[in-house]
């Protein structure tokens, strides 16, 4: 579950409503802690079981417009590590997070520039963006015995986006933009054309 009232209300990161931020953290990260805590107290997960949450690269890198959801995802990943140690030592329960490619979701629909981000990630990723279905298939492996020794990790499922600096496809897009700027530079005598 992930949701930010600040994003939904169009609040920028430098103008957060702190009550909304508290709700963002509670819904998008602390709820994960609560669920694991209850499962542990009730002994609801078998030995060598697995818990997986979805994160996003904005937990570690600045992505303009992702807003306070980046803070929530960073907290989510920290919870996975901290509880991963405790639950792992007790019952060998594995806890991981998966950072997925930008994917159109209800929660993501409020993120400023999501369509542009998806296009950028597609151009940057050697394998292209991973679909929601691809992500579901990947997460299934984390519930299998094939990943019995994988825990406390944030695992990237993003077509290679997280390891890229610049791709040829993305550079070509920038070159087109730069050529456009060169041709039209006289239209904006006082700057770069941003209003």
Question: In which residue ranges do the predicted regions lie?
Answer:
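Non-catalytic terminal and boundary segments that flank Rossmann-like NAD(P)-dependent oxidoreductase
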Residues: 6-7, 19, 168-195
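C-terminal helical subdomain
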Residues: 30, 97, 115-150, 155-159, ...
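Generic structural signal for alpha-helix termini and adjacent loop/cap motifs
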Residues: 38, 42, 144-148, 166
